[in-house]
Amino acid sequence: MIYEGKAITVTALESGIVELKFDLKGESVNKFNRLTLNELRQAVDAIKADASVKGVIVSSGKDVFIVGADITEFVENFKLPDAELIAGNLEANKIFSDFEDLNVPTVAAINGIALGGGLEMCLAADFRVMADSAKIGLPEVKLGIYPGFGGTVRLPRLIGVDNAVEWIASGKENRAEDALKVSAVDAVVTADKLGAAALDLIKRAISGELDYKAKRQPKLEKLKLNAIEQMMAFETAKGFVAGQAGPNYPAPVEAIKTIQKAANFGRDKALEVEAAGFAKLAKTSASNCLIGLFLNDQELKKKAKVYDKIAKDVKQAAVLGAGIMGGGIAYQSASKGTPILMKDINEHGIEQGLAEAAKLLVGRVDKGRMTPAKMAEVLNGIRPTLSYGDFGNVDLVVEAVVENPKVKQAVLAEVENHVREDAILASNTSTISISLLAKALKRPENFVGMHFFNPVHMMPLVEVIRGEKSSDLAVATTVAYAKKMGKNPIVVNDCPGFLVNRVLFPYFGGFAKLVSAGVDFVRIDKVMEKFGWPMGPAYLMDVVGIDTGHHGRDVMAEGFPDRMKDDRRSAIDALYEAKRLGQKNGKGFYAYEADKKGKQKKLVDSSVLEVLKPIVYEQRDVTDEDIINWMMIPLCLETVRCLEDGIVETAAEADMGLVYGIGFPLFRGGALRYIDSIGVAEFVALADQYAELGALYHPTAKLREMAKNGQSFFG
């Protein structure tokens, strides 16, 4: 044993060849934390000091290679002054450079996922051999930063600027065959032959058959592009990537600028350029919010794992109510491996549900994401039925009938008589109280809410709603089933609107107030889209459906009359009464017509102004900043109330619910992190400036206390 640590070992294999193996004790994956970096330094020094070493193979003792840096540790460094952050980064980079400079050939054997620092470790090796099932990539831009362990320096010198820019700016994971095409790796083999292939490569390099020094040299030098080639490559890339990323995500363009600034430098000077740019990005609001979301997501995954311990396995599911929603749920279940019965009361509903599932499957086949054989297998996993005959074997039933409490209660009571006593019933309701629906059941402990968002195949969130009598087993089993379907479940307690709709309707309330104050809804949409929302509130209301919004608004007003009830008619009333229901019937705030591909195209329709005229009660002069505040303050304050009321347990769950459920701007991190970014005291003062708009704008006593004590939602 040449070196033995808790994360890394270096052992002799044969004939002077050693294996540097990453295998972090007590963890399921390898990652670069302080311990691993320190041990890599010691391991490299030990190899350097051993004159008998003739070659090094880098490997992993886990199913993955290295997933990247331990962001929970490194995020603390981001708070350091720039000079300290840069110095620390360069110190870490010296380890990778010293490994690269070893006076013997090196081969990285990539057995599984190698991301971020994991791939950067591989780039420092002379040769890379990759299992055909592995994936590699530099996903740092998704955290608002860019690669900081030499990725912006080595990758463009290995695979060319255009390819490197695509990899770094997109943050995508790349399959083995694609990595081989651009020469990011030297060979691809089946996983069982990886060790032998790495050994063969290192022997050929030791013998001189492969010139490892020549292979290494381009990574140490400046880029092989003249001034004109550089200008064409970088300026074109910056323009394209800036258009794709938008102004709120600076990391992709900064990465290109860094590669450009370092183009005429050798490795060590180029690494200094990388470190300076990395420190700049680490201080941005976008990186703070995006890293916060990543950490929130990790917290959610940990919570979901706790439920796994008591959950029952759902081997057979059922959905009640076919149609588009039922078909979407059936598709999602069957495509992820859980067969599902799809029941409706008539053939038309069944046909609609099957058509929806088939449409989604055909779309995947057309895009090359699924084989026709797999499509047939998924369709066979959806069994349509008009009766309860086969429900005796069902583990979990999702009720997805019309959003009416009496209808839902009747259907749930009926199905309860046809399933096993331990079967779980879940209602896909967006607003109706789970505890109210449970009153119709003999076994309310087996009943929960399971709120899918539309369209089911695209929206990642599922709210699992715990009613007053819902058992831990029912909640856990539903969470596990949602995960199995490829969704991100969040457990919420019962209340009108649960989490997402309870928070969304105050946002719509702010929008309604603006329209009634004479503000053009097209302008409001533009301002909120610029703020970062995927679509403005008028367009979103059209997509949701004016009738759906009208019903939801009434449910929320009944549940929270002190702040959500408005006796005046609003824009949604005017459109609903005029039967302008949004995209579903071609007219809402906007008009819609299908383009050549059948996609709904949004058009400005001046006739809506006459419809809205009676609900415009004044003409206020508001700034764009006012528009943002009228919209965002009620949304943020309702999120605070949800946390205070225990509807969600943690700030992380609240923020992730809004990101996954309604497309809250990623770079702003969620409603509670948005408050933190302003400052709790400053946000309370801001809300007080709009207090005359009503109770939705009034901070809670607890929030005022937080402001007074200088507290925040995230440390």
From Swiss-Prot:
Alphabetically ordered keywords of this record: Fatty acid metabolism, Isomerase, Lipid degradation, Lipid metabolism, Lyase, Multifunctional enzyme, NAD, Oxidoreductase
Which residues are listed for NAD(+) binding in this entry? M325, D344, V401, V402, E403, K408, S430, N454
Name the segments for region: 3-hydroxyacyl-CoA dehydrogenase.
312-715
The UniProt induction remark is:
By palmitic acid.
Q: Which residues bind substrate?
A: D297, N501, Y660
- What reaction gets catalysed by this protein? a (3S)-3-hydroxyacyl-CoA + NAD(+) = a 3-oxoacyl-CoA + NADH + H(+); a (3S)-3-hydroxyacyl-CoA = a (2E)-enoyl-CoA + H2O; a 4-saturated-(3S)-3-hydroxyacyl-CoA = a (3E)-enoyl-CoA + H2O; (3S)-3-hydroxybutanoyl-CoA = (3R)-3-hydroxybutanoyl-CoA
Q: One Pfam annotation, family name?
A: 3HCDH_N
Which ranges form a coiled coil? none
Q: Does the keyword Lipid metabolism apply?
A: yes
The ranges of region (Enoyl-CoA hydratase/isomerase) come to: 1-190
Residues at the site labelled Important for catalytic activity: E120, E140
Its Enzyme Commission number(s) read 4.2.1.17, 5.1.2.3, 5.3.3.8, 1.1.1.35
Q: Tell me the Gene Ontology biological-process terms attached to this UniProt entry.
A: fatty acid beta-oxidation
Q: Which GO terms describe its molecular function?
A: 3-hydroxybutyryl-CoA epimerase activity; delta(3)-delta(2)-enoyl-CoA isomerase activity; enoyl-CoA hydratase activity; long-chain-3-hydroxyacyl-CoA dehydrogenase activity; NAD+ binding
Any one GO CC term of the record = fatty acid beta-oxidation multienzyme complex
Task: Answer yes or no on keyword Oxidoreductase.
Answer: yes
Indicate the residues that form the catalytic site: H451 (for 3-hydroxyacyl-coa dehydrogenase activity)
The metabolic or biological pathway listed in the UniProt record of this protein is: Lipid metabolism; fatty acid beta-oxidation
Protein function = Involved in the aerobic and anaerobic degradation of long-chain fatty acids via beta-oxidation cycle. Catalyzes the formation of 3-oxoacyl-CoA from enoyl-CoA via L-3-hydroxyacyl-CoA. It can also use D-3-hydroxyacyl-CoA and cis-3-enoyl-CoA as substrate.
**Per the similarity annotation, which family is this?**
In the N-terminal section; belongs to the enoyl-CoA hydratase/isomerase family. In the C-terminal section; belongs to the 3-hydroxyacyl-CoA dehydrogenase family.
Subunit-level organization: Heterotetramer of two alpha chains (FadB) and two beta chains (FadA).
> What is the name of the protein in this document?
Fatty acid oxidation complex subunit alpha
Q: Which organism is this entry from? A: Pseudomonas fragi
Q: Which gene encodes it?
A: fadB
